[in-house]
Curated annotation (Swiss-Prot):
One of its GO terms (molecular function) is rRNA (adenine(2503)-C2-)-methyltransferase activity. Gene3D superfamilies: 1.10.150.530, Aldolase class I. It catalyses: adenosine(2503) in 23S rRNA + 2 reduced [2Fe-2S]-[ferredoxin] + 2 S-adenosyl-L-methionine = 2-methyladenosine(2503) in 23S rRNA + 5'-deoxyadenosine + L-methionine + 2 oxidized [2Fe-2S]-[ferredoxin] + S-adenosyl-L-homocysteine; adenosine(37) in tRNA + 2 reduced [2Fe-2S]-[ferredoxin] + 2 S-adenosyl-L-methionine = 2-methyladenosine(37) in tRNA + 5'-deoxyadenosine + L-methionine + 2 oxidized [2Fe-2S]-[ferredoxin] + S-adenosyl-L-homocysteine. This is Dual-specificity RNA methyltransferase RlmN. Reaction proceeds by a ping-pong mechanism involving intermediate methylation of a conserved cysteine residue. The active site is at E93, C332. The gene is rlmN. Its cofactor is [4Fe-4S] cluster. Keywords: 4Fe-4S, Cytoplasm, Disulfide bond, Iron, Iron-sulfur, Metal-binding, Methyltransferase, rRNA processing, S-adenosyl-L-methionine, Transferase, tRNA processing.
Length: 347
């Protein structure tokens, strides 16, 4: 028996090819695509402007996958963490960061992560597998049933550039005018520093935003806290940032997790400025969110303010991120912190 095709794994051109293989006209693909993403159709029977015969054929050869949250935790600041159970028993999390008129959804790209960043709780769990295109898109579809989403950041569980074969089609679906209709200016892909994959991302999706998790200004420290630096050290990473095709006046976002006593001094701020001054950039300072068993600590308020002021005074665009969702383990670096506990049955 032939395995059915999940249509949410297909971009619009791929869906056109799929239906062409069934002898169908090209415009049928656009009809089906719109039903899936603009009407949230979960069955072919809902597609009332398509003939019964075509619906029956689709039913025989394809299906429309779906994700429903197993649990939703709401933080004191309104942040929501969604726990999604996957068909194979694995789980991933997404985080909705509410902001009046411009809600941001942080989505996952992998189950676990292979990068092993020392300050990230998700990184303490080994990579189990990549998410499919459908599983990435379905996180957005599920949360969008609750609230309007304006921004997508691929900063959840996993390293997006380690799964480009599924991430790139998912983003094409996000920004397709017949799909999720998100502006490419509102989609940001984050990486810990896979330099060759940055080149591929820029080539295949030149209009999305790039965020680079930098977190250190010397190879010595970055080697210690981010093992990927041993393969792609700062010089190679920053060269890839310079080559990334930024449209218009957009900038690379450098994410900088501030670790108390390690990378939060004025000397670090000075080195950061020297390293990045020839790259159009903005800096997100992220005070470290402590978790049980971690070896690092949060920076002091004084250290955060001094670092921020040094960069601002030198005309760097810099934002110190609030620790949104930390009370529900939904803050940066905390995903999967309460996953197992959340899934345990209560007596």
């Amino acid at each position: 028996m032939t395995e059915k095709t999940d249509l949410k794994n297909l971009t619009l051109p791929a869906l056109e090819q799929f239906l062409r293989g069934q002898g169908k006209e090209r415009f049928r693909a656009t009809q089906v695509f719109k039903w899936i993403y603009q009407h949230d159709a979960r069955s072919f029977q809902e597609m009332t402007n398509i003939s019964k015969d075509l619906r029956a054929e689709l039913e025989a050869k394809a299906y429309i996958s779906n994700l429903e949250p197993e649990a939703v935790e709401v933080g004191g600041d309104g942040t929501r963490k969604y726990l999604f159970g996957l068909e194979d028993g694995n789980s991933v999390e997404s985080v909705l960061i509410p902001d009046e008129g411009r809600n941001t959804l942080c989505i996952s790209s992998q189950v676990g992560c292979a990068m092993g960043c020392a300050f990230c709780l998700t990184g303490t769990f080994r990579l189990t597998r990549n998410l499919t295109t459908a599983e990435i898109v379905n996180q957005i579809m599920a949360v969008r049933r609750d609230v309007e989403i304006r921004n997508i950041v691929m900063m959840g569980m996993g390293e997006p550039l380690h799964n480009l074969d599924n991430v790139i089609p998912a983003i094409h679906i996000m920004i397709d005018g017949n799909g999720l209709q998100l502006s490419n200016r509102r989609v940001t892909v984050s990486t810990c520093g896979l330099a060759p994959e940055m080149e591929r991302l820029g080539r295949e999706l030149p209009n999305v935003n790039l965020a680079v998790s930098l977190n250190a200004t010397t190879d010595e420290l970055r080697d210690r806290i981010m093992p990927i630096n041993r393969r792609y050290p700062l010089k190679e990473l920053l060269s890839a940032c310079r080559e990334f095709p930024l449209p218009g006046r957009r900038k690379v976002t450098f994410e900088y997790v501030m670790l108390g006593g390690l990378n939060d001094t004025l000397e670090d701020a000075k080195r950061l400025l020297r390293l990045t001054s020839d790259i159009p950039n903005k800096v997100n300072l992220i005070p470290f969110n402590e978790f049980q068993g971690c070896e690092f600590r949060s920076p002091t308020r004084a250290a955060i303010d001094a670092f921020h002021k040094y960069l601002i005074d030198r005309h760097v665009t810099v934002i110190t991120r609030d620790s949104r969702g930390s009370d529900i383990s939904a803050a940066c670096g905390q995903l999967k912190g309460k996953l197992d506990a959340a899934r345990q049955p209560t007596e």
